[in-house]
Amino acid sequence: VRIRIIKFLSGIFIAIIFLFGVGILVLPYLVSTDMIRIRLAQELSAWTGYNVQLRDPPRLNLFPYPKALLSGVTLASRMDGVAPLMEAESIEVDLSVVDLFRGRVSFSETRIVHPQFVMEKPVKTMADFFDRFSRSQGALGLAIREAREILQHNPENPEIDHLLKQPFGRVVIENGALVYQDSFSGVAEKITGLNATFDWPESTEEVRLRADARWRGEFTKLSIDASQALLLLAGGKSQIKASLNSVRGGITFTGQARLSEYYIFDGKVSMRSPGWNQTLSWVAGKQFWGHKFKIPIVWESHFLARPMHIQMNNVTFTMGKTNARGALELDFQDHVPNVIGSLAFDNLDFSFFRPVFFSVKEKNPFFQTEIFNHIGVDIRLSAPQAKLSNITLTNLAVAIQIRNGHCIFDLGHANILGGSLQSNIEITPAGQKLWLEGRASGTAIDMQIVLEVLGITPFLQSRANFTMILRTLANSWSGIFAKMRGELALSMSSGRLLGYDLNDLQRRLAKNEQFFLMNDNTLSTAFERWNIQTSFSDGTTKITESLMRTEDWSLSMWGTIASAIMQDWQDKLTLQAKLQKNNSSETLCRDVQCLANSLMQPLTFSLNSKGQNRGNFWVKQDDDAN
């Protein structure tokens, strides 16, 4: 019995092999290559609405699985004089074995080898891109138009289940190219090495696209998943996840989208850039502002985009080693983007922004004002700690406004140089020059730190309150100081003058008409109050009043300095001075000390630093001194 069973099964197995072999042999005779050619042409034409041209008859391969190979395939517009949408070296289609035995042709997967796609006109918007499909006379265009009719009746809860479920399957593109026109420059560009897999089982189901190519010199990956692709193409809403990545940067959006004239993107966006300059040069060349900004950026936020308006909440981003949180809005007025919002940094280094606002021309960096006419800004910045060159700031609160070519930088508060500072600076382009007007005030500023920051050996220990007003019109940084006009008032309640002793100065003035006054680190003078009033104009500084009061003396100085830059004052100082005793009177004294002090005549003299080392002066009494 066992032997009979084995013989029976062996016979069945041999029969199956025989029938399979016979089927393979007769299969090419059952399937007409013309049938494959016609069916493929019908399918492509029905879906795209384009005419399909096949240069050669298809070839049928049965091993390792049935497939048809067509060479020289062209998708051409039905309008004369329009470039073909696609020209492919070959198209391979996987065939269903069951349908082949029935004498029918059905495709499970289509591979397009070495195609070149041509988009003759620039696509201005995503809606414009998909609108081209909806206008086609193929099955895809018909399905999109039917979905649009459903959306018109019930835009919030469209029911597309009853639509005819058009099979689409899988399309694979191998080593293709795409030629298109850049929407900004109008120049034709080419994407090469295009490999893509497009999965869309049926028109009412989810779409999955995976693609990679070389775009603008970089290997780039694109990924798109849409849960309701047909609704999306028809202008409805769909859940979508899309990402674009390369070594130059990447962006991912996850959320709900509607691609129409009144588009909407509502979800989460994540962006990374190894260097903002690298990302901009890759995406848009050097035609956008900020292309010199080299800091790496990582960004995440909720993202809501509508026509002419973008809102980003719950912003968290990293810029170099700086982290920030906040909210931003972007809208457009007369095609000019306007950014509004606030950002809170954990620390901020203003040197990051130097390449953005400053250009270098013949080793003379200056402010770039072109951006003022191309963007509007109203942003509040805050940071518990910030850095400006080698100056540290804490509790920073800043407002920046740019509108109609006019920039306002408002420093609401900052702890700086041991005290606090407020300032307001307005910048307005004037042809090739820059009009700058500013006001600043400070409280309890440590003058010793100020001098150290300026690179000057400290000759003063005190805290000062100050107010400053300045105005200038210039086309370079050196021109700002050369043409600057304004006033500066300093008020110090107490402190110490380092390197000099007024008692020693009085004794030397009493004995000599002229002498050399040197800075001596062992000497100092404590003062009770020191008020200074200065003005500057056309590269010169005028000290209108400088009154220092010590316990015993009052020292007044005035004069003009041929420089508006404090670091250059050393060899340009020529000041007049008067030294006199305190508690004196020219009329009536009420005590003996006042009487004694009044009998001492004030000493008037000049201080000249020309040709001297820093801190040294040539002192000469006035000829008419009493």
Place the predicted regions along the sequence by residue.
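N-terminal type II signal-anchor transmembrane helix
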Residues: 1-49
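Transmembrane beta-strand segments that form the barrel wall of outer-membrane beta-barrel proteins
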Residues: 237-242, 309-316, 382-384, 406-412, ...
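Elongated, acidic membrane-bridging lipid-handling scaffolds
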Residues: 136-265, 366-402
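Secondary-structure transition motifs
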Residues: 50-51, 72-198, 284, 330-334, ...
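Extended terminal
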Residues: 1-14, 305, 310, 315-319, ...
